[in-house]
């Protein structure tokens, strides 16, 4: 078959260990720095932006949203929904508001989604939770100017799974106009053979059922615009996954752009969304302004 299937176990582990590929910091240090940067950015956002925190979209302890609101009182703003990474087993919405200030200042509401991470959460449940959060937002803000998904790493996987949702079973259809998928994993099968699955305990069936690469639907007439972004210093496997998922969407008729972001690694590619002038911040604002 070639590719990841032919890699020795140790090499595959390395490919799916994003912290080993950062030229800025050591493996452990870059993860701690990422948690610190996103937590501090979220604290700054909560201090400077009007918020509705811990809004429940379901009965579960983690089924809550943090909403960062622009000044528009009519609720006709566009909504960016941010889905955090952490390999489906760490981080939370409480480190996920760092991108709010530059977007809210331009009239965009930002929503950070909480979901049950492993080992409490399993993959099917996480996907359902994120989908339910979108249905909840569609009902809460029926007059919004569209929903834009933004997911990082495991969150990009969950955002990609949202794109293949049959909304009939969720009671509401969100008006998803765009998706920004940052340094994601779109085929879960290689993950089965790495340390990442120790906490997830996925079977091959679960991995296949929840792999966006295997769930690419033909684009609807009003299909949203998708940006697949990857870091210069992501691993070759992460870069391959982004490339192949973008190509699969394009082959199915979706409007897709691929962005290779220079000078960043798997972590600061998303951390820099706290900056007004950062390329991805500008891409998101441009996507929203075109809709």
Model-derived regions: residue spans:
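Alpha/beta-hydrolase superfamily serine-hydrolase fold, recognizing
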Residues: 1-291
